[in-house]
Amino acid sequence: MNNYTTINVKNRTAINVKNKDMKMNVTAKWVFTFLFVAAASMLHAGAYTNPVLPYDYSDPDVCQAGEDYYMTSSSFNCIPGLQILHSRDLVHWRFVDAALRWRVPGTEQAASDSPEYGCGVWAPSIRFHKGRFYIYYGDPDRGVYCVRSQATSGAVEAFPLEWEEAVLVKPGKGFIDACPLWDEDGRVYLVHALAGSRAGLKSVLMVCELTADGLACKTESRIVFDGHPDHPTSEGPKFYKRNGYYYIMHPAGGVATGWQVCQRSRSPYGPYETKVVLAQGKTGVNGPHQGAWVGYWFLHFQDVGVAGRIVHLQPLRWQDDWPVMGNEGEPVSQGNVPDKAVSTIGENANPRLFREEFSTTDLPLSWQWSGNYDARYGFCNAAQSMLRLFSYPCDSIPASPSLLLQKIPANRAFTVTAKVRFTPLKKITGHERAGLIVAGRQSYMLDAPANGEWTWLRVTVSQNHDCQFYTSTDGKTYIAVGKPFRAVEGVWIGAKVGLYCTRDRVKINDSGYMDVDWFEIR
């Protein structure tokens, strides 16, 4: 994350665009609401098209509580982490919570230090057990953690929940991709994988027994499956039990090109029979694997490069006590789900238009900071319906924990626009910067003018992720700035777009700031 390019206002070409200066009035909001509801009604006749979530939700897992489904996914270094999405039909998803609100557990460095890109929260599993939600995940540098909710009914109306402090269940480097199983006899098991970069071994799956509360190891882990040589990079296991069989479902073969494997045994420690249950075959869906079995469905991701890992839904049936996924083991492009009322609780996780006007005191859950949270990053000034970001010290903009970012949509072109006003601190003129960022392994920034005046910053992104920055002084005429560039994915995640307000590490007792009137992805 050390590579970056800053675009200043040079080599400009003017174009005229529709004026988006004004905040949406009540009538406009009703129009957008009507259009969204109408579109949802037309699409929600039980049919769906994959991907059901064309955004980066890496390593998704799902559990069921009553008639409600809950999803979480890898959040790595981003905060809030372990975002929780809700659905009634596995197709329409909305944000309802995040289990890690402030920091990645175990990170001892100050929030002002650089984020640990690609580290932190890997491949979580979520379960609802005896009135509590449990989320287990592996941190490749620290071990397996469990985050547990306070007692709850499981109904979506109870969200957001109170979450206990994360517990380090299994300390040690290289333990990743953990999933629990509560057996009928009260015993609790944990399956996990190994990160080769830390453990010096990969492609094996391990099982240990946990204490009754699921918060500590009762036994040492032992290998129950070796993926060498037929199933290399076996990881991301999920643990289930059905008809007396213990099942471990996991991906193998690599993120972009692998397949889904199912293991079954009469004992949690094996020996296990092995079968490939989902693969690309003759379809265009590469690497259809790593996800969740729930009811008659299997959710998994597809790595699409710059936009990250997007979520697909496959039908699932059972034959001879083996799962049959998709269309005889190949992913489907369309399907049908039971027609259920779409929940309106929470923020839509798959909007065609995303527009944030910062009219409340809390940021919506779709926003994530690039590192551990610090209140000095900024705040939502609901009284004036705007966001204020303070300049935060860092070594470089991509290395700042204070980047405020959004996932990008896959498989379509889109435009990002923000109306901003950058007011630097005169005492440190030239040491502060603020603006619009396209973040990834290579990051690109468009600096806002340091004049305390409102300006419009824009980036257009093609379906192939070719980008062009623009600026405007009136929201009507936009001027191309700099050369076109291509967005680049991040470390284990897709590229993101968002905002920055940073400064060099100079000694000062105050800060400049950038106000954001609104931010839009369309």
Language-model features, listed with the residues they occupy:
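Short, linear, compositionally biased motifs with a strong N-terminal bias
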Residues: 18-19, 37
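Bacterial N-terminal signal peptides
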Residues: 30-41
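Carbohydrate-active catalytic/glycan-binding domains of CAZyme proteins
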Residues: 2, 45-522
